[in-house]
Curated annotation (Swiss-Prot):
Function: Dolichyl pyrophosphate Glc1Man9GlcNAc2 alpha-1,3-glucosyltransferase that operates in the biosynthetic pathway of dolichol-linked oligosaccharides, the glycan precursors employed in protein asparagine (N)-glycosylation. The assembly of dolichol-linked oligosaccharides begins on the cytosolic side of the endoplasmic reticulum membrane and finishes in its lumen. The sequential addition of sugars to dolichol pyrophosphate produces dolichol-linked oligosaccharides containing fourteen sugars, including two GlcNAcs, nine mannoses and three glucoses.
InterPro entries: Glyco_trans_ALG6/ALG8
GO biological processes: dolichol-linked oligosaccharide biosynthetic process; protein N-linked glycosylation
Catalysed conversion reaction: an alpha-D-Glc-(1->3)-alpha-D-Man-(1->2)-alpha-D-Man-(1->2)-alpha-D-Man-(1->3)-[alpha-D-Man-(1->2)-alpha-D-Man-(1->3)-[alpha-D-Man-(1->2)-alpha-D-Man-(1->6)]-alpha-D-Man-(1->6)]-beta-D-Man-(1->4)-beta-D-GlcNAc-(1->4)-alpha-D-GlcNAc-diphospho-di-trans,poly-cis-dolichol + a di-trans,poly-cis-dolichyl beta-D-glucosyl phosphate = an alpha-D-Glc-(1->3)-alpha-D-Glc-(1->3)-alpha-D-Man-(1->2)-alpha-D-Man-(1->2)-alpha-D-Man-(1->3)-[alpha-D-Man-(1->2)-alpha-D-Man-(1->3)-[alpha-D-Man-(1->2)-alpha-D-Man-(1->6)]-alpha-D-Man-(1->6)]-beta-D-Man-(1->4)-beta-D-GlcNAc-(1->4)-alpha-D-GlcNAc-diphospho-di-trans,poly-cis-dolichol + a di-trans,poly-cis-dolichyl phosphate + H(+)
Gene: ALG8
Transmembrane segments: 4-24, 102-122, 156-176, 194-214, 235-255, 291-311, 329-349, 356-376, 379-399, 420-440, 450-470
Presence of keyword Ribonucleoprotein: no
Lineage: Eukaryota, Fungi, Dikarya, Ascomycota, Pezizomycotina
Species assigned in the record: Chaetomium globosum (strain ATCC 6205 / CBS 148.51 / DSM 1962 / NBRC 6347 / NRRL 1970)
Enzyme class: transferase
Keywords: Endoplasmic reticulum, Glycosyltransferase, Membrane, Transferase, Transmembrane, Transmembrane helix
Name of this protein: Dolichyl pyrophosphate Glc1Man9GlcNAc2 alpha-1,3-glucosyltransferase
Length: 474
């Protein structure tokens, strides 16, 4: 009997219906963030957008996204002009939340990823639309004839959300080697291609930043886009190297009296409180932005060497993925939501063979489980858990059937790590979501967050190490 697969239209209908059902769901502070940005772009002239600070939710996205908010504000006028008043702080109610969700659902892709499901359709952001642009750019890079459009589309994406700068080194090296230099010799420059790419990127940047540059506001925009005054770790530790570093620091605080270690009293509450700009370590040395930048740059440069030597599309996607890994694992003040920078490009090559799938599997589990704390109200618990677990089961079963055998030897230990890691995730989810509250009530509230973050960090780091091996041995 032939297998039956749903059509794209059927998936779109189901996805759209599900997103409409989520209109009354939990409303995060991001609702007020985007309402305030609508109000700023509608109420003030262009020159004041990046200076206005009536609300703590100041505009800190690049100009193209600010222009998008202005367009959305013109629609919001028809719904309720009161929501466009800057002083109407915390204005969003259920009806306005529904109208914003409806507009946002129409603007994003129909991907059924639990990550986008949690971040965009409940927590409320616009990642789906921008990841759709990223995927289009990555796909366009596959053909020489559309390589220019890939670079220009990515440049436009950078002007919408600056987090994609993390992936820019891979784009720079690939476009340089595959488009600007001759395939026969790196010492021969294709000048016409350089002119077309440079002019296109210049036009995009000029459109985005030109009006602000005329007023001398570029430094102010950069201050908003790159606020290094914030701490190393976000309020909830992103599952990266610094989460593991923070966990070790917490353990050493307990062991310090026995080991004779000195403890900085002023830092004892810093990591557990997770306040912005408040990250300090009690036993281990503090980490500076320079250290984060240096580590990120080093671990991004390593895969770029192979990409420059062998500028194939598979190597390009691998380098984009590894640039995402490096920035997520070693970056300063990384948000847990940034894990999608790794998951989404990696998914394009996860089925290349079983070695790729073996590296992707723990990332898929860790990345999606790490997003659970974003939805902390009881009403969303069954939704996020059942949907994510169901998606992961389908993914593990379907991808396992579809991934072809590798022509190279697989790594026994890594395969066992992947299986064990996925198995442990089930009791961890149960404890952090239900068990802790039953046993401890409202005491030790930081423990489930710490366990989730640290466990997820092990999966992400393990996946990164595994994929580095796969990338350089393929």
């Amino acid at each position: 009997m032939s297998e039956i697969y749903p059509s794209l239209a059927q998936c779109a209908i189901v996805a759209g219906a599900l997103k409409i059902l989520l209109f009354p769901a939990y409303k995060s502070t991001d609702f007020e963030v985007h309402r305030n940005w609508l109000a700023i772009t509608n109420s003030f002239p262009l020159w004041d957008w990046y200076y206005e600070k009536t609300s703590e939710w100041t505009l800190d996205y690049p100009p193209f996204f600010a222009y998008f908010e202005w367009v959305m504000s013109q629609v919001a006028k028809l719904v309720d002009p009161a929501m466009l008043k800057v002083y109407n702080l915390e204005f969003i109610d259920s009806s306005h939340g529904a109208s914003k969700r409806a507009a946002q659902a129409a603007a994003i892709s129909i991907l059924l990823s639990p990550g986008l499901f949690i971040i965009d359709h409940i927590h409320f952001q616009y990642n789906g639309a921008m990841y759709g642009i990223l995927i289009a750019s990555l796909v366009l890079a596959r053909k020489k004839s559309t390589l220019l459009w890939s670079g220009l589309l990515f440049a436009a994406l950078l002007c919408m959300k600056h987090i994609y700068l993390y992936l820019a080194p891979a784009y720079f090296v690939f476009l340089l080697r595959a488009y600007c230099l001759s395939p026969k010799s790196v010492f021969r420059i294709q000048f016409l291609n350089c002119v077309k790419l440079g002019a296109g990127i210049g036009a995009i940047l000029g459109t985005a930043f030109g009006p602000f540059a005329l007023k001398g506001q570029i430094p102010q925009i950069f201050n908003r886009l790159f606020p290094f005054s914030r701490g190393l770790c976000h309020a909830y530790w992103a599952p990266n190297v610094w989460a593991m570093y923070s966990f070790v620091d917490r353990v050493l605080i307990v062991l310090a009296p026995r080991l004779g270690l000195s403890v900085k009293e002023g830092a004892l509450q810093s990591v557990t409180r997770g306040l912005v700009g408040d990250t300090a370590f009690a036993v281990l040395p503090d980490v500076t932005p320079r250290v984060c930048f240096a580590l990120t740059l080093i671990f991004q440069a390593i895969p770029l060497l192979k990409l420059f030597a062998q500028p194939t599309w598979d190597n390009f996607i691998g380098a984009v993925t590894l640039c995402g890994y490096a920035s997520f694992l070693f970056g300063w003040h990384v948000h847990e939501k940034a894990i999608l920078l790794v998951i989404i490009p990696f998914s394009l090559i996860a089925l290349k063979d079983r070695r790729y799938l073996g590296a992707f599997r723990p990332l898929a589990v860790a990345g999606h489980v790490s997003l659970f704390p974003l939805l902390f109200t009881p009403a969303e618990f069954p939704l996020k858990t059942v949907y994510t677990v169901f998606w992961l089961i389908l993914f593990l079963m379907a991808f396992d059937r579809l991934a072809p055998a590798s022509s190279r030897a697989r790594f026994f230990l890594f395969d066992r790590f992947s299986t064990l890691y996925i198995t442990i995730s089930i009791p961890l989810i149960v404890y952090c979501s239900l068990g802790h509250g039953i046993v401890f009530g409202k005491s030790y509230e930081f423990l489930p967050l710490m366990f989730t973050s640290s466990y997820s960090a092990i999966g992400v780091v393990g996946s990164w190490v595994g994929f580095m091996v796969v990338y350089f041995t393929s």
